[in-house]
UniProtKB/Swiss-Prot annotation:
InterPro entries, A to Z: Ribosomal_eL37, Ribosomal_eL37/eL43, Ribosomal_eL37_CS, Ribosomal_zn-bd
Phylogenetic lineage: Archaea, Methanobacteriati, Methanobacteriota, Methanomada group, Methanococci
Gene Ontology cellular component annotations, sorted alphabetically: ribonucleoprotein complex; ribosome
Pfam families recorded: Ribosomal_L37e
Stretches annotated zinc finger (C4-type): 20-38
Record organism: Methanococcus vannielii (strain ATCC 35089 / DSM 1224 / JCM 13029 / OCM 148 / SB)
Family matches, as HAMAP family: Ribosomal_eL37
Cofactor note: Binds 1 zinc ion per subunit.
Annotated protein name in UniProt: Large ribosomal subunit protein eL37
Domain of life: Archaea
Family statement drawn from the similarity comment of this UniProt entry: Belongs to the eukaryotic ribosomal protein eL37 family.
Classification via Gene3D superfamilies: 2.20.25.30
GO MF annotations in UniProt: rRNA binding; structural constituent of ribosome; zinc ion binding
Cofactor(s) recorded in Swiss-Prot or TrEMBL: Zn(2+)
């Protein structure tokens, strides 16, 4: 095993994100101890943004 640039490519074996206890998505960062999807570990409020869901207008097919 050599050191330097060739060895840096071998640092991608582990996974940074595991399944979140609160939202169930694979977005809980192990080292930061916070969920990127719902904000668990960072705040008590669930992280919500309007742009995450498609806006539906009228009486047509509703997205679930």
């Amino acid at each position: 095993m050599t050191k330097g640039t060739p060895s840096q490519g071998r640092h991608n074996k582990g996974s940074n994100h595991i399944v979140c206890r609160r939202c169930g998505r694979r977005a809980y960062h192990v080292r930061k101890k916070a969920c990127a999807a719902c904000g668990f570990g960072k705040s008590t409020k669930i992280k919500r943004f309007a742009w995450k869901w498609k806006k539906v207008t009228g009486k047509g097919n509703r997205l679930k």
